[in-house]
Amino acid sequence: MNQLDQLKRLTTVVADTGNFLQLAQFAPQDATTNPSLILKAVQQAEYAPLLTETVARHRGLPLDQVVDQVLVRFGLEILKIVPGRVSTEVDARLSFDTAATVARAHRIINLYDDAGIGRERVLIKIASTWEGIQAAAELEREGIHCNLTLLFAFAQAVACGAAGVQLISPFVGRIYDWYKKSAGANWDEAAMAGANDPGVKSVAQIYSYYKKFGIATEVMGASFRNVGQITALAGCDLLTISPDLLAQLQASEEPISAALDAAAARDAAIDAVRYDEPGFRFALNEDAMATEKLAEGIRAFAADAAKLDKMILAL
């Protein structure tokens, strides 16, 4: 049995791509998108007609509404292939505006509803800022489920769990990138692999905390750099994986066993933590990696959103 099929026995496998034509070969349960992945997809020849057609159909609407139409169109195509959920992201430029994030989420979910897609098949993706987490809490109370992304710090995970969000996406690879760059010539790749990888350790800590205290929020490891990071998190609730790494898993017959164990986590010696807004902001500020990576991630998604805007305006 290949590694992908083995992994599916332990974890819900999610495809991290806007390239929906690649999905069927991997048979994932869910799929995730973000502004960068959608931008990458629309720059490929096979998706150009979809972009052109969607923009033409909604010409005359304000730009931000046309963008949401494009994002949802990709989501609808993905949902024709995956049996589960798709994550569609709110504009990263709204990451510090709770009310605007809620309003944009309403618009996205209404577009899916107009297309006959139930709320249970859509996750609204929001950056894990304090403002984003408050928006998600409000949306969850309305029955609109959220995926809190750009999550790098334990404090972000604790706040998301307390807010009752459906799912979080802790970023394994970007955490790994930061520590590797910080260590420079002193980085020992072999010693820092697998369970010792700082990104893997972050997800494992969050997973254990949630299971210990019965927090229902799903943990979906994201942003992987290599197969070793994925197999080191086998047993996590979900893992969202790029097509390149899905293909590598599919090509390997190496055995995989569960690395995370909910029952063991429930017996772990962990103390409960709570954060109000000042405490959250201070904890995040104390974590240089998380502070830098959250800011960098928002900037990158905002820049790609602006590039997509320009592409649409040029049509």
Swiss-Prot record:
Pathway as given in its UniProt record: Carbohydrate degradation; pentose phosphate pathway; D-glyceraldehyde 3-phosphate and beta-D-fructose 6-phosphate from D-ribose 5-phosphate and D-xylulose 5-phosphate (non-oxidative stage): step 2/3
EC number: 2.2.1.2
Reactions catalysed, as given in the entry: D-sedoheptulose 7-phosphate + D-glyceraldehyde 3-phosphate = D-erythrose 4-phosphate + beta-D-fructose 6-phosphate
One BP annotation, GO: carbohydrate metabolic process
Keyword terms of this UniProt record: Cytoplasm, Pentose shunt, Schiff base, Transferase
Record InterPro entries: Aldolase_TIM, TAL/FSA, Transaldolase_1, Transaldolase_AS
GO cellular component, one term: cytoplasm
Keyword hit for Nucleus: no
Residues annotated as catalytic: 125
Keyword Cell membrane annotated: no
Similarity section: Belongs to the transaldolase family. Type 1 subfamily.
UniProt function note: Transaldolase is important for the balance of metabolites in the pentose-phosphate pathway.
Quaternary structure annotation from Swiss-Prot or TrEMBL: Homodimer.
NCBIfam families: talAB (TIGR00874)
Protein name: Transaldolase
Gene giving rise to this polypeptide: tal
